[in-house]
A protein has these predicted regions:
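Receiver (REC) domain switch/output surface
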Residues: 97, 106-130, 137-138, 243, ...
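Short regulatory alpha-helical coupling segments
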Residues: 294-315, 334-344
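Conserved helix-loop-beta segment at the catalytic/binding core of cyclic-nucleotide signaling proteins
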Residues: 286, 335-369, 378, 382-390
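Active-site-flanking beta-strand signature of metal-NTP-handling nucleotidyl enzymes
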Residues: 154-155, 293, 315-326, 349, ...
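Amphipathic HAMP/coiled-coil signal-transducing linker helices
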Residues: 276-298
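Two-component/phosphorelay signaling modules centered on CheY-like receiver
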Residues: 9-31, 160-183
Length: 423
């Protein structure tokens, strides 16, 4: 598949390998520019992606280029433009949110990372276009969340060597952390949690690392995950790099490994946010873009309808409230998304401002609802982490089932002291 440009390659010395790799991938047109001319080139012809093929010792020129990218984003309604930066000796480039790649790796891998980042740009463009289209039909257009994606990102740290505690600590200063001491634990976390990056620490042999990389390579949804491998597994990285474009070996301290991975983690979390936003737009705002559950006003409207339908048909209906008193924003959002995955297709839910989650079980009596709610609470306790990194988020569950004399207000009043007011 050809890469539709233009693409800007910034370097004071000719970057023939990068240009040739881009041409081999079908990229067109390719604009080469020196650092002194980079800002003017971007202004004249805004690129789809930027490759910093060599470093820039002049911080003023780098700042001018960064400002030019900000201006381009403003003109394009904030559209994301990927910047891939070659870093000498694995040093982090002094360029905000640049996706670093070691200068010594083949240029084909650089193009692979650019292609992965362009998928996020395409998704972002689709979301912005759909928002403009929806705005012509209704005034109730949901806003794209603008918080830092790192605030809701989660990283899997797998390993059982001496570096594992320091990696978890370093990652926990920036993002949510899920620890795994075995490849089975890592695979379980991948299936049950929202993961935006993986760090494979020391303590694993080559076969274990290969097994974990195979799990990632075999599923399309994992292939763009940023993966940092700590340890000397060069041969494995080279063999999996064609199918895992964001796979890289990192050395140095735990803080250095996390610093390298953070721009990739932020980008992956942003991509997940865009997918939730697209689902929200598909549902014309009925789905909350943060949680993936129903928007609050829609939930209470649907609850009223479900109560009326159940009363007319004589069908069972139950409601549960999951309260998470110790949860911060990140934990609360992840819990809501996890509940969304655990629910049956006939059920619906929303999250309130206090992070509590209301879930309606249609055609379900109190006994059956108790079984389902207990299973959800058990998964939350086993899977979720508290803010201090300890497993087991405290989850209080209250249940009620519809009685013949019930209204929506009386049903909800039995599970909460002060029922939320529908918007």
């Amino acid at each position: 598949m050809a890469l539709q440009g233009p693409f800007a390659v910034i370097a004071d010395q000719p970057a023939r390998d990068v240009v040739e790799a881009l041409r081999a991938a079908g990229a067109y047109p390719i604009i080469e520019a020196r650092w002194a001319d980079a800002a003017a080139v971007l202004h004249a012809r805004p690129p789809q992606g930027v490759i910093l093929a060599d470093g820039c010792a002049d911080h003023a020129r780098a700042a001018v280029l960064e400002k030019a990218l900000e201006v381009q984003a403003e003109h394009e309604a904030g559209l994301f433009t990927p910047v891939i930066a070659r870093a000498r000796d694995d040093l982090i480039p002094r360029f905000a949110d640049a996706l670093s790649i070691a200068a010594k790796v083949p240029a084909e891998r650089l193009v692979g990372r650019l292609t992965a980042a362009l998928r996020v740009r395409t998704l972002h463009a689709t979301v912005l276009r759909r928002m403009r289209t929806l705005a012509t039909r209704t005034n109730a257009v949901p806003d794209l969340p603008n918080a830092d994606p790192l605030d809701e990102a989660g990283v899997l740290v797998a390993g059982r060597g001496r570096s594992h505690p320091s990696l978890c600590t370093a990652a926990g200063e920036h993002v949510g952390v899920i620890g795994a001491l075995t490849v089975e634990g890592a695979a379980h976390a991948l299936k049950s949690r929202d993961i935006d990056g993986i760090i494979i620490g020391d303590g694993f042999g080559a076969r274990v690392v290969e097994a974990l990389l195979t799990v990632l390579a075999e599923e399309a949804r994992f292939r763009d995950l940023p993966v940092a491998v700590v340890g000397n597994h060069t041969a494995l990285i080279e063999s999996f790099a064609p199918v895992l474009p964001n796979l890289e070996r990192v050395g140095g301290s735990a803080a250095h490994a996390i610093e390298y991975l953070l721009p990739y983690i932020r980008l992956h979390a942003f991509g997940r946010r865009l997918k939730r936003m697209l689902a929200c737009l598909d549902a014309k705002g009925a789905i909350d873009p943060d949680t993936g559950l129903l928007a609050n006003a829609v939930f209470w409207r649907d609850l009223n309808r479900a109560v009326d339908t159940a009363e007319k048909r004589g069908a069972a209906l139950s409601i549960a409230r999951f309260s998470l008193p110790a949860a911060d924003r990140r934990t609360g959002l992840e819990a809501a998304r996890l509940v969304g995955r655990l629910m049956r297709h006939v059920d619906f839910a929303c999250q309130e401002a206090d992070k509590s989650i209301f879930t309606v079980f249609t055609e379900t009596d109190l006994r059956a609802a108790h079984v389902v709610a207990r299973r959800i609470a058990s998964v939350l306790k086993k899977v979720m982490l508290t803010t201090d990194g300890k497993a087991g988020v405290e989850t209080a569950v209250t249940l009620a089932t519809l009685k013949p004399s019930d209204s929506t207000e009386s049903l909800v009043a039995r599970i909460v002291e002060e029922p939320p007011k529908p918007a």
